[in-house]
């Protein structure tokens, strides 16, 4: 498993981050199997969130065994300081740890959300206090939607977040406005030496409506690629960008083996683009969705 430097934090993390959303609504057996598969493949960054159902509890059963050899991150999606502070403490209890390596402000995808989180008595203040108390090692920000890169650029101008997690994939890069926002964010990330993490790598499109034969086969809110060739190409394309520290694995345990295999089966960016440009139904996930 390739490792890359997580910005100024200096930590060399696996390029695949295990996404705890995959554990939100599955059995302990499926959770354990997926976590072990990731560990065996060399994944050492495990991410979750307070909003991911039982994910923190599923992680918590493993922490006694693996905490000292992984980078652990979680998120708070609350915007008010006191509520976020309570949620941070609850997350630590659910994870069965004294601290996490990274706490992220969750789903900050537009300026209204950013204003609430970064304003007086916002969740950013709770995160800063938690860091001062040794409960979290670093502070990051995440978000979905077309406005995420521009919002995260503004966030970095307001506060030196250690990491940014934002959407990036081949189809998003074909939107000139989105690409321009992403490239501006990358410049600021590099200037501040922050870590850049990516989501929506294997998103194919929104789930089709009204077709029972093409229903929601996975727990992801978008329809993912699930042919190995397409997964290989999507992962390869994202990891061909040197600014990307790593990518979050998709939110379904059944996709874990394919993404682990894709990290091993790299193709060039040009090869990946040839495959993805022919992928049927490939479109932005941010169409008619609440982000």
Regions found by a protein language model. Give the residues of each.
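Alpha-helical scaffolding within the catalytic cores
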Residues: 1-4, 56-58, 87-90, 148-152, ...
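Active-site groove signature of glycoside hydrolases
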Residues: 92-115
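Conserved, mostly hydrophobic/aromatic
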Residues: 6, 18, 38, 46, ...
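A short, structured active-site edge motif that brings together acidic residues
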Residues: 69-80, 102-106, 166-170
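Short, acidic/polar
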Residues: 26-38, 81-96, 146-156, 229-237
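Acidic (Asp/Glu)-rich catalytic clusters
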Residues: 7-10, 40, 60-68, 89-98, ...
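N-terminal binding-site loop/beta-alpha segment at the start of enzyme catalytic domains
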Residues: 1-70, 126
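Beta/alpha (TIM)-barrel catalytic core signal, keyed to glycine-rich beta->alpha loops juxtaposed to Asp/Glu
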Residues: 108-291
């Amino acid at each position: 498993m390739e490792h890359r430097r997580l910005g100024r934090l200096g930590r060399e993390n696996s390029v695949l981050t295990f996404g705890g959303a995959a554990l939100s609504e599955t059995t302990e057996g499926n959770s354990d199997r997926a976590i072990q598969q990731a560990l065996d493949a060399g994944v050492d960054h495990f991410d979750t969130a307070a909003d991911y159902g039982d994910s923190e509890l599923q992680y918590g059963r493993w922490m006694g065994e693996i905490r000292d050899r992984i980078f652990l991150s979680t998120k708070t999606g609350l915007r008010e300081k006191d509520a976020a502070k309570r949620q941070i403490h609850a997350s630590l209890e659910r994870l069965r740890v004294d601290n996490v390596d990274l706490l992220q402000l969750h789903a900050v995808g537009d300026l209204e959300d950013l204003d609430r989180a970064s304003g007086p008595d916002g969740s950013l203040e709770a995160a800063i206090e938690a860091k001062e108390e040794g409960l979290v090692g670093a502070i990051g920000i995440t978000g979905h939607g077309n406005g995420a890169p521009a919002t995260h650029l503004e966030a970095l101008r307001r506060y030196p977040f250690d990491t940014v997690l934002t959407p990036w994939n081949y189809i998003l890069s074909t939107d000139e406005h989105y690409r321009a926002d992403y490239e501006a964010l990358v410049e600021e990330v590099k200037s501040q030496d922050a870590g850049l993490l990516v989501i929506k790598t294997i998103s194919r499109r929104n789930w089709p409506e009204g077709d029972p034969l093409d229903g929601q086969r996975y727990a992801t809110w978008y329809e993912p690629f699930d042919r190995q060739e397409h997964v290989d190409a999507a992962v390869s394309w994202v990891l061909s960008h040197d600014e990307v520290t790593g990518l979050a694995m998709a939110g379904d345990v059944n996709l874990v083996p394919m993404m682990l295999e894709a990290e091993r089966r790299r193709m060039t960016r040009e090869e990946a683009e040839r495959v993805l440009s022919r992928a049927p139904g490939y479109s932005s996930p941010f169409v008619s969705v609440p982000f």
